[in-house]
Amino acid sequence: MEKIQRICSLVLLAAFWGCVPVLHAQSFDKLWKQVEQAQEKSLPQTVIKLTDEIFRKGEREKNTPQMLKAYMCRNTYQNILTPDSFYVNLKGLEQWALHEQNPVSRAVLNSLVASIYANYADNNRWELRNRTSLNLGETALPADIREWSANLFVNQVIKYTGEALKDSTELLKTSSRTYIPFVILGDASEYYHHEMYHLLASRAIDALQKVSWFDTDSLVKKDIMGIYGQMINTYRKMPDREDAAVLTMLDYMAWRNREGDVLLRPRAVKEGESEAPNQYLRALDRIIKDYGKRDVCAEAYLAKARYYRNMRKYPEAVSYTHLRAH
């Protein structure tokens, strides 16, 4: 869907509690500058050494964001030098998430774990498709994920995305601004009041979509619909989140259309009707009716224009583009 640039691009997820003293921030900045120089010179061992130093410094000073950034950067270079370290680092991240006490920090960690499992499954899609499903409980999982079947990855992604969004109240109260520079605020971030709930919900949907290819029981699709539904209901109930509600509804409808869902299926023409009613267009019209005075509603007009263009109804497409321009 060609829409407003996505809200927050997560460079390295981290949790940031309170304000870090300027002296500490400068010290971390100096260390990260050295990391950048080592990266430019292709010195992975130096990067690992420096990020380990940053991690330990963050641990001493209880600076969670610096710990997370250093942890993820160090892991990346360890994985390059020693591929098997990927599996050890994943377990370490899971343990960190399990024992983290701060609810938002825990949500961030669970989101990271979910994405790692989803990316691994997506990158090994062909091999996993040819494996027989293993019906195993959580306690019976093989220690080596290289022995897992596709359904086990699906289960883990469902588990960790659920954990990431469990404390939605805290996420709604936490601004993604406090995560800068680990979160880059996109052009549309202000529409969501820069809160962490939408960021982690979007990441959860992305992770679930990556394993939807293996979902034979529609559990993933059900979870995605549930996340969208919860987001829409949440934003509709909040008096200052009309824009967030509009954008989330449009995202939801776009996803359902990509899934070939009922919204775009041809329906029987009733007697006296010139063409079959279309639920997708009706939904867009409802958004325009309810939120037409808001600037963000231009996205609904553009969605209608794209729909008519795809149906090769060019006069209608042009008319809605014209309406949007005004």
Q: What residues fall within each predicted segment?
A:
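Start-of-helix signal in alpha-solenoid helical-repeat scaffolds, especially tetratricopeptide repeats
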Residues: 28, 48, 64, 68, ...
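Conserved small/polar residues in nucleotide/adenosyl-binding loops
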Residues: 321-326
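Bacterial Sec-dependent N-terminal signal peptides
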Residues: 1-28
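Short coil/linker segments at helix-helix boundaries
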Residues: 80-100, 120-187, 210-222, 258-282
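N-terminal leader/linker segments that initiate helical-solenoid repeat arrays
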Residues: 25-50, 64-65
